[in-house]
Amino acid sequence: MKQARQPAEREGGGVEQKTSSRSRYSMRCNMANCVSAHILIGGRLARSRYPELIEAIKADNPAVDWDGTPFDPDDIPVGKPLALMDHDVANGCFEEIEGICHRHGLHYVRWSGASPGSFPSVRIVYTGNGEPQPVLTTEEDEQVFSIERIRKLGSIETIEADYQRARRNPPPLVIVDDQPADVVILEITHG
C-alpha cells in the first residue's frame, strides 16, 4: 500500500505545504467570483522578456482552448495573437498576464463573463499604452450600448466607430531578438 507523502518540516517549526500553480489558483477562486474569460495577446516582446510572460501564464494557469489544453511555451502562434482561456478566472481578470502586458507594452483584449450581483460581462481593450478600456458585453461577447452611452456618442457613425474599436483584435504576438543583427558598416574612402 502506497503511503501519502508527509509535508516537509520548515526551519523554525511548522509544516511547509507544497502547492501546484493550479491549487494556488483554485484557492484564489474560492475567495473570489470566478467566471469564464479569454484573452488575446499581441505585439512585440523581446526574447529576454518571454520567460516573464511564461511565468505569468503559469501563475494565472489558463489553457489554449476551452477543453483545458495546457499552454506550451514552445508553441508561439504564427501570424496571430496568443489566445488563452479558462472557465474559472478569479474576478474575470488574468492578473499576472495583464500585468506583464502593461509592463512590456503588449496589446490585449480580454473578455470575461458576468458574476451576478458583483460585476457585468465585459471586454477590456488595451492597446499597449494608456489605460485599459472597458466595454460592456453580453455573455456571448457582443457589445452592449446603454442609452447614456448612445447619447454621449451622438451619431450612428460615432457609435459604429466605437463598436469597431472594441471589436479590434491585437496584432500577432511576435518574439523579437534583443539585439539587432550585426550591422556591417562600410567605410567610405575619400579620394
Each language-model region and where it sits:
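Positively charged N-terminal leader segments that act as targeting/secretion signals
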Residues: K2-G14, S21
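Polar/charged alpha-helical tracts
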Residues: S48-E55, A59, T69, D74, ...
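N-terminal interaction modules that seed assembly of large macromolecular complexes
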Residues: E55-A90, E95
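Short, extreme N-terminal segment that most often corresponds to the first beta-strand
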Residues: R22-D65, H190-G191
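Intrinsically disordered/low-complexity terminal segments and short unstructured peptides
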Residues: K18-T19, I188
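The N-terminal extracellular segments of secreted preproproteins, especially immediately downstream
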Residues: G12-G13, R28, I100
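Glycine-centered flexibility motif
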Residues: M1, A32, A37, I41-G43, ...
